[in-house]
Amino acid sequence: MKKITFIAILLLCICSLTKAKEKVIEQPPFIAWTSTSIQVDKVVLSDTATVLYIKAFYHPKQWIRISGQSFLKDNNGETYALRSGIGIKPDTEFWMPESGEGEFRLVFPPIPTSATSIDFSEGDNVQGAFKIWGIQLKGKALPELLLPQEAIVHKIDINDELPEPKIEYKDATIKGRILDYRPGLVSKIVPIIFDPVKGAYESEEVKINNDGTFVTRVKVPTTTSAAIRLFGKMITFYAVPGEESSVIINTRELCRQQSKFHKDDKPYGEAVYFGGTLAGLSQEYSNCTLKTSILNDYRQLFKDVAGMDAGAYKDFIYGKRANLLASIEKAPISKALKAVLGNQVDAEAAQAISLTEMVIKQAYTMEHKMSKEEAREYFNTAQIELPENYYANAFRPLASINTMAALYNSKLSELIPYYLRRRTDELTKAWGTDKGIYFDINKAGELYSSIKEFTPLTAEQEVILATLPPACQNEVRDANNQLLKTLEANKKKTGFTINEVGNVSNEELFSSIISKYRGKVILVDFWATWCGPCRMANKAMLPLKEELKGKDIVYLYITGETSPLKTWENMIPDIHGEHFRLTDAQWSFLGDKFDIRGVPTYLIIDREGNVKHQKTGFPGVAQIKEELMKVYD
């Protein structure tokens, strides 16, 4: 009996010693991450392993994946390769449950007790890699952050009026600094410019210096909304012609605000400190939590308006507008911000009114639970009865979008080309004029659209351009001059081939297209010139195509008649590969054959002509390479 008792005590002591060697850090604070999709719930340190307990937050029935090349790096620079996963298999899809929340563990070698923090990374060669920096191992606080002198919080005067926007086509300087920066955190940023003439676009990539600073210049025609997307957050500010705007980005606070585990912790200061022109307004706008959106939930909108006619729908939209404007008016914010937010509400109301017939039809199909075929037939044949002068009357109260305040509204860059351009006559009737900033921007935007489609300005268009403000004239002429240079340069470019499909039946079309490349691996890209993700993907693929140069891989691009011929002809010189442009009937047939639901859609064809992989949406360079190599090898 004594012997049994002794053994039991000995085992208990051994267990206690083993347990004592474990250190558990619950929900450790961290400095930065690339995604909110994986978050560290706890870290368990022992002399045999380091285990990260991960909580995953992602779309239900979608997957995430952890690279087998993942590693930890401690603050001393030592790295520790991933050993295994518990509840997840590295390099294999982890499917999210209905709740959109999952959990698993990642096991690494033990880390010395001298380490105070670790970084987790899937590596720089993984597209969209998960990375978390500065995971703390010694307590619940991050190291103290010393703010630079220029990181100030501006005092807001609620009586401040919105200043007149500066209208001039000139460089705006954008400067910034990322706090807690270290090489590898992020190497570049891409400012987004909400240009009222060109529409929203991404400017050139800006390199971040080793001290976390960056600077760039962007030509804008007026005071313009701009933004930087960083660490999952959109940082908005104003770019002003001939002037400087600056942002100091508090990385740890920006990420803390998005953390499931730390969002209620004490703040680390402001997420962003604004400087330069309109810094106070940028700060106030950034911190504002007032709702200004009428169309934030289309599905709910369709439910709300089911059974309404056009008049009732208009009243419903104006009811929502009135509620939003009332909440803005009561808010303790500056007159300047009230003007900006009010203009955004009116822009959304105008968008909603422009969609009257579509919304009523969609609400009807959902209410009656129509099939796709039934809904398509209904959309093509149903006529929504509109009261006389419906659009003119409905747009009449929204004249604020024809005032200078609209130039502060980032929604303007989308509202005009996509929703209101076809309603110009009704807007003229509604407001009793065809003059004003809205009409100037609309005309300039129309001229720019033809340039964007690789069509230089005509003599008639030059006459229209001459009637516009000098800033609009200069921006459009600058774009036209750049186009003329591009067209001339395209004449000398090689590396692309325009192919004809010949006289073949639809059933033989695809096999005929790929037949001349038999014996090679083919990456087929169904794309369109108007498809932004397609164009971004083509640019992203350039380094991979260079890396695989010399291998028996053919890059085959297929588009349809929705890609304007001239635009297509002048875009493909920069897309090396084999190009085909199909008729609408041919495109539709292949769309049905391969069940293509959107562009870009990729097929990978083996050397015998068999489809081995299909994916809609650009999956990233790394995954395309992986799938190509599976077939190639």
Predicted features and spans:
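Conserved redox-active cysteine motifs that mediate thiol-disulfide chemistry
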Residues: R518, F526-P543
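Oxidative protein folding and maturation machinery
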Residues: T251-G519
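Short, well-ordered beta-strand segments enriched in hydrophobic/aromatic residues
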Residues: A49-H59
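Short, solvent-exposed, Trp/other aromatic-anchored flexible loops in extracytoplasmic proteins
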Residues: A81-V126
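Structural microenvironment flanking redox-active thiols in thiol-disulfide oxidoreductases
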Residues: M536-P573, Q586-D592, E626
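Thiol/disulfide oxidoreductase modules built on the thioredoxin-like
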Residues: A585-M629
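A non-transmembrane, solvent-exposed segment enriched in polar/low-complexity residues
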Residues: I86, G134-A336
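Bacterial Sec-dependent N-terminal signal peptides
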Residues: M1-V24, V631-D633
